[in-house]
């Protein structure tokens, strides 16, 4: 399921460590033994610590070794003023289980896992954000099936994973087509199962992001519903979020701040080193062809870094409302409770110093 790696600041080497047993329990779904994170102090007006004491460590729940790779290739990993351990997971729900068990401190995720964290009573505020092309997600069509419009989704078997950005994309697609969840067959799967399920015809439709879109299209007879149809179903937002207990701890909250800054600088490095990123990550790590790697990088567009402000909170609330309208949330939640806006100052500084942008440039 995952491979842990521990890094020490200033060292280029990597050592493999046994992940905490509690993380294993988390990924197996043993959730009943852990308590929800509950704020013990109001951090909104508490100054964000900046001093990272020696010996501070963060456990980062990564996906596809992506954050670990971008930090390493950009040179930011060696600059981190704390020890970091990476554990690789598949999908936001598995990461939430690790958070619940206290087996991870911070993680990169899509825009939906933080919503389900709120609904589950887990206090895991967003501390950083990035924006990529909304066209990066595709509705993939299985071989031998026909679907060229969103109206064609009616009656189809659609891969569906609660607590993921793909969940919101499916619900928005149905709403845009004037369909309800009862008009289709939602096949509940793990994200890791989506690609094989659609290319083998176990489902008719699956929402995929790269590199799985490119992998799918290698299968004869597969296709995607055109972007002109799917515009607006995926926001392209991704986040860094951390357990509240971590953001309330002076040492770890300062370490998270350093990670947020490195996150911005590392992805801005991708913006200016696209070919190198394509080769080192997608070709060497994800094992796609050089041609496919270039296609993937182009599809994601330029990374930008939104302010952590009311505008972003409102965007997140709109996603919450879309999921709630479909009856897919157990209770009403407020996006405002899922952010730690203190980290915006660090985002703003890192954007200015690295030459990055807060918003995509208009074409």
For the regions a protein language model found, what residue spans apply to each?
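Bacterial N-terminal signal peptides that target proteins for export
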Residues: 2-20
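Bacterial signal peptide processing site
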Residues: 34-37
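Short, glycine-/small- and polar/acidic-enriched structural segments
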Residues: 39-180, 185-188, 204, 210, ...
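Solvent-exposed, polar/charged alpha-helical surfaces in well-ordered, non-transmembrane soluble domains
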Residues: 69, 97, 101, 115, ...
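Pocket-lining segment of extracytoplasmic ligand-binding domains
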Residues: 112, 192-285
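Secondary-structure end/capping motifs
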Residues: 249-330
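Conserved C-terminal helix/tail region of periplasmic/extracytoplasmic solute-binding proteins
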Residues: 321-363
């Amino acid at each position: 399921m995952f491979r842990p790696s521990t890094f020490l600041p200033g060292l280029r080497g990597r050592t493999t460590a046994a992940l905490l047993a509690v993380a294993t329990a988390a990924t197996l779904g043993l959730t009943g033994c852990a308590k929800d994170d509950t704020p013990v102090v109001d951090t909104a007006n508490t100054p964000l610590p900046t001093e990272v004491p020696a010996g501070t460590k963060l456990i980062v729940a990564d996906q596809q070794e992506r954050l670990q790779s971008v930090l390493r290739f950009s040179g930011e990993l060696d600059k981190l003023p704390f020890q970091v351990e990476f554990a690789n997971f598949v999908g936001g729900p598995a990461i939430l289980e690790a958070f619940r068990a206290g087996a991870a401190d911070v993680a990169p995720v899509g825009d939906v896992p933080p919503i389900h964290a709120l609904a589950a009573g887990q206090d895991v505020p967003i501390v950083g954000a990035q924006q990529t092309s909304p066209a990066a997600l595709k509705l993939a069509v299985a071989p031998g099936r026909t679907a060229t419009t969103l109206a064609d989704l009616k009656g189809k078997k659609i891969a569906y994973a609660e607590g993921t950005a793909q969940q919101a994309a499916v619900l928005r697609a149905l709403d845009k087509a004037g369909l309800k969840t009862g008009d289709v067959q939602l096949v509940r799967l793990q994200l890791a199962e989506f690609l094989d399920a659609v290319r083998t015809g176990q489902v008719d439709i699956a929402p995929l992001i790269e590199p799985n879109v490119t992998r799918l299209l290698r299968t004869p007879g597969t296709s995607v519903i055109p972007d002109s149809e799917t515009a607006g179903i995926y926001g392209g937002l991704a986040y860094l979020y951390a357990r509240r207990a971590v953001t309330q701890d002076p040492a770890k909250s300062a370490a998270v701040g350093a990670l947020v800054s490195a996150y911005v600088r590392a992805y801005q490095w991708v913006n200016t080193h696209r070919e190198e990123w394509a080769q080192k990550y997608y070709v060497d790590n994800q094992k796609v062809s050089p041609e496919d790697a270039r296609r993937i990088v182009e599809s994601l567009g330029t990374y930008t870094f939104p302010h952590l402000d009311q505008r972003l909170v409102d965007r997140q609330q709109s996603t919450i409302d879309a999921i709630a309208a479909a009856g897919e949330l157990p209770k009403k939640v407020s996006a405002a409770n899922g952010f730690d806006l203190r980290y915006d100052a660090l985002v703003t500084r890192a954007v200015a110093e690295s030459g990055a942008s807060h918003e995509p440039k208009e074409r």
